[in-house]
Design a protein with these regions (language model features):
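Short, surface-exposed ligand- or partner-binding patches at beta-edge/loop junctions that are enriched
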Residues: 82-83
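Conserved active-site aspartate in kinases
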Residues: 33
Length: 131
């Protein structure tokens, strides 16, 4: 994996295309989507049931209780794959959580792609739109 310096920590990067392999090797993994509720409802959400991992949907946008919400939901023993639309908000979230003792990886191409890599949805990884 590539490493990206952000503040004083090094957050590992993972592409959406490598997630299935990563989960096979690290079954104690969860996915955390930090986009907004509006994005989840219009663009869709990753559906990780068939990948055998849990997903959590906790927005980072203007939410002062973000870290507390994560602490209530996600165990620090789990590997946390952090996702947003294109990797920008998720690197911030991954860094915040790493500073709290979480083992985080940033999904660098996010749900929708980043111009360089296609992203979760465009790779045909399972997703749903709640209606």
């Amino acid at each position: 994996p590539n490493y990206l310096y952000w503040g004083h920590s090094m957050i590992k990067q993972i592409k959406s295309s490598d997630i299935k392999k990563f989960i096979e090797v690290n079954p104690n993994t969860v996915l955390l989507d930090v986009r907004t509720e509006d994005e989840w409802n219009t663009v869709g959400k990753p559906d990780t049931k068939n990948l055998g991992i849990k997903s959590y949907f906790i927005t980072i946008s203007q939410d002062p209780s973000f870290i507390d919400s994560v602490k209530k939901s996600i165990n620090k023993k789990e590997q946390v794959l952090v996702m947003c639309a294109a990797g920008g908000r998720s690197i911030i979230a991954a860094n915040l959580l790493a500073n709290e003792g979480y083992n985080t990886l940033n999904i660098s191409d996010g749900f929708s792609g980043n111009g360089q890599d296609p992203g979760w949805k465009n790779l045909g990884l399972p997703s749903v739109i709640d209606r």
